[in-house]
């Protein structure tokens, strides 16, 4: 007789292979056809709200691996919150204005752009941005990210532009907006001001020069004995091109300075830097003649090296001993510290450089010259006049434009600023930073330091594609009309016709009838031509999105972006909200690191180490990308490589195989009919459910705390160690051999059903496709998608400290027995573990008591045919985990049962089934 037909062997159509690249699009199609996101939304409307506000990526180019990391993290957060009983809508957004898009359109238009109006150029930009919104939307959806893809927020919609204009009006209303001439980051290539967040630092080689500024005037009384001698203050700079803009030399009021004699010359520098500077200048024969305190030279003058004008000696605390000479070349038009200290001394904010990075034509010696080519000419002039002491080259970190990657400059121009001091914006923002939960905690210090030290916010840009700064100027007296009511009127027009109106219509048609200049009464006006910084655009998204969709909450529960956004979107959103509402727009801020290659190196097309999301999806599926996101501690830089993805693919396979094995053994199981009551479950099954409950608690807490890597390790460990290596392995005999409806088998199936049901829900936020696939194969009545369900609640706890402690000890004994079985296998005593009879001995005590309590279950726990407790095993193997345990493995007694493969002395006792053991005969008799 073929006894295989009498066994309860696993049976499932759930595929062994994930074949994710093919299967995932089918699942996406199913979600779309069933309207899954809409059903999730509908089901959650009455629940507590959890709003994650999406930071808008640029609508420009295909998504990269950093985008994938960010969107998947957000999706994991939202899905886990929904499964925890929250209403968690997701409104994706796109940043549609700004330089990245305008430059791409410029490139596309080429020479045609010269003959186009601003409105025509803006229309091209809108078409371009719209095209990339659609492409990126599909790419994000392919990752399994669920949201309102058909109703995103775009910073270029009429409504959004109107809100942006209104938020600017609120700053005007509160007196926070002003126009001034200050040095700002300027890109001569892109011809526009740049925000702090648009500046990247990269290694750059610059000239390094030491220059003499000859003292001109009467020496202080303390140095009278040096009268008549040639005295010069020595400065050091890496920007020779700024020497034509020099107006002062700055000293630290609290540092001692030295007069150094070198031949017939006297050089002034900080005393603490003398030896280093002299070594750098190659001067060995020198001596310090005098030391003095800097204030004795305050407001005295040097001569500019090659212009006939004074260079004022001033004092400033920003001067340090970290580099240079302690005498700082000061050009108020080309540096923030220079500007601030220059204001204190009434210096002109002089800038001799135009928008394109050329000296103005009237700049003596260098007129019309590009500054990046002027360093050599300036050095030559300094040499000619005998002022250059040393010229060399230095490699250092230097600011570059984030778009064109070219070095930028500090340059004073007329710009619009939001004041950090008016209405106490800086102080209020710093205070509110402490109201926010920063994850990780160091995020708080990072943004605090940035806000504490940042200059006024330059919000004007000299480009076409953006929301205009809705300020008018009197055509007669030139005064700016900073009137919030007029600005609100314009915003209402934008609501209907968009901000293109600003560039299309004359000022008269954009203003309320009867508007006159408050200064001179004139009624003719011109319009501001600058547009708003895109960081202001995205910074007001809390007002444009959260305040305008009634199903979202303000402030948001969470902002989640890369760590670069402490100086970007987190920063601009904080200032935009505190400046108008005196509240933060977010309760919590979570940041992740950057994606690097497997060796921890930055990704670069030139190096060839870029990992593209679409390539990963084609090879492994989006699911492995999602698992990669969850498996990493995202707070640091996150590594990715084929090796890492392959390792995760193997881990995924183990999780999938665990699910498949359980599904196979749930064949024919109907939860409504076959579930065993909690108090009827076998002890091993109760232990498994206790471990499940522990896992569920840890995983749910990890979701709540955004510790996703804990989830990956916990679930993977549970599936591969506690389930596959022990529990499911031990269950095989009971599941396959026991009677179909026996309590032993139904108890195991009940536990497995509950385990799979719980785990499928637990992994759904991460392995969204696979969880859905498992869900479709689960027995019993259930919702049409796992994503419409919630995490499992345990109304009756299975946790039992005494039970879990007993099984911890049994597992240690099992580990020692497994080692003994492996030795016996190597010595050819046995082949399979079922060939074995295990002898155990232990002295009186806890171990022996445990063995005696579980005497009848030990064989199934060890997956051997027989276990016998004996008084003494002198030749037994000493346990590694339990040194008082002795283990010996022998060949099992009796014959091998053809049905269960266990050895038993009862095989042959049955005339009807002579090849079976008593247990199998009993099962067949009861059928």
UniProtKB/Swiss-Prot annotation:
Gene3D superfamilies: 1.10.730.20, HUPs, Ile-tRNA synthetase CP2 domain-like, Valyl/Leucyl/Isoleucyl-tRNA synthetase, editing domain. Keywords: Aminoacyl-tRNA synthetase, ATP-binding, Cytoplasm, Ligase, Metal-binding, Nucleotide-binding, Protein biosynthesis, Zinc. It comes from the Bacteria. Disulfide bonds: none annotated. L-isoleucyl-5'-AMP binds at residue 561. A motif ('HIGH' region) lies at residues 57-67. This is Isoleucine--tRNA ligase.
